[in-house]
Curated annotation (Swiss-Prot):
The keyword RNA-binding does not apply. The keyword Isomerase does not apply. ATP binds at residues 112, 144, 149, 182, 209-212. Pathway: Cofactor metabolism; pyridoxal 5'-phosphate salvage; pyridoxal 5'-phosphate from pyridoxal: step 1/1. HAMAP family: PdxY. Gene3D superfamilies: 3.40.1190.20. This is Pyridoxal kinase PdxY. Homodimer. Keywords: ATP-binding, Kinase, Magnesium, Nucleotide-binding, Transferase. InterPro entries: PM/HMP-P_kinase-1 (IPR013749), PyrdxlKinase (IPR004625), Pyridoxal_kinase_PdxY (IPR023685), Ribokinase-like (IPR029056). Its EC number is 2.7.1.35. Substrate binds at residues 10, 45-46, 224. Pyridoxal kinase involved in the salvage pathway of pyridoxal 5'-phosphate (PLP). Catalyzes the phosphorylation of pyridoxal to PLP.
């Protein structure tokens, strides 16, 4: 059975971020994606200028009520949330999660708590970080912070892999069953590798791949793709190890393709066959 994922995050008309980055790769792995956009911008904000609007929070709820009205909400296997335009949008998303789980008790909530970036600092509207700490985290089944976001969620510094595992376990005590630390950055074993951790109450998997050097301008949307692909693989029944290995390789293929084409925006269409069947392989290690 093909899995259906309600993906609630940002949308850009030009380029790739949020749903505009993750939607196609998720579909390429064989999932039905229902994109619901928290913002519609001309382009992502790292360009320094953009046009567009943040969707009214009630818009999100209205759209989902429309899906419920045609009796399709029970076919939703998971809700994925990413970039929020406001804390109030977050409250509406949690209402949507409750509504989906009422229609399908097996449905999962994957929260990508987009708040900041090791190089960019905090990048969200006031109140969003507090929303994730107080409400998003306890409501989630799976949560996928980067290092900055992990520190915000656990409310203390994380300096190495061991501390990252302990911090992830602190989050698990508050709600989620799975924590993906999607960029260990300075807390990783090696400064010249891209490292991730996948943590549950009784398992820890670590993986690393080469960093792809884009100089001063790192492509946007890598985390969005990572979260979306991990959710698809887990819904399709992959083990933690299998999911982590496939996602790491698929994202690496996108990065290598983007670099080879000398582009700044993620080249998800050009890399599509290697998203489905990566040519590289990176082995996850159980810690």
């Amino acid at each position: 059975m093909m899995k259906n994922i309600l993906a609630i995050q940002s949308h850009v008309v030009y380029g790739h971020a949020g749903n505009s980055a993750a939607e196609f790769p998720m579909r390429r792995l064989g999932a039905n994606v229902w994109p619901l956009n928290t913002v519609q911008f001309s382009n992502h904000t790292q360009y320094g200028k953009w046009t567009g609007c943040v969707m009214p929070p009630s818009h999100l709820t209205e759209i989902v009520q429309g899906i419920a009205a045609i009796d399709k909400l029970h076919t939703c296997d998971a809700v994925l949330s990413g970039y929020l335009g406001s804390a109030e949008q977050g409250e509406h998303i949690l209402g949507i999660v409750r509504q989906v789980k009422a229609a399908n008790p097996q449905a999962k909530y994957f929260c990508d708590p987009v708040m900041g970036h090791p190089e960019k600092g905090c990048i969200v509207a006031p109140g969003v970080a507090e929303f994730h700490v107080r409400h998003g985290l306890p409501a989630s089944d799976i949560i996928a912070p980067n290092l900055v976001e992990l520190e915000i969620l656990c409310e203390h510094a994380v300096n190495n892999v061991e501390e990252a595992v302990l911090a992830a376990r602190e989050l698990i005590e508050q709600g989620p069953q799975i924590v993906l630390v999607k960029h260990l950055a300075r807390a990783g074993y090696s400064r010249d590798r891209f490292e991730m951790l996948l943590v549950t109450a009784d398992e820890v998997w670590h993986i690393s791949r080469p960093l792809v050097d884009f100089g001063m301008r790192q492509p946007v949307g890598v985390g969005d793709v990572t979260s979306g692909l991990l959710l698809v693989k887990l819904l399709q029944g992959a083990t933690l190890q299998e999911a982590l290995e496939h996602v790491t390789a698929a994202v690496y293929e996108i990065m290598v393709t983007t670099k080879a084409m000398q582009e700044y925006e993620l080249q998800v269409v050009a890399a599509q066959d290697r998203i489905a069947k990566p040519e590289h392989y990176f082995s996850a290690t159980k810690l």
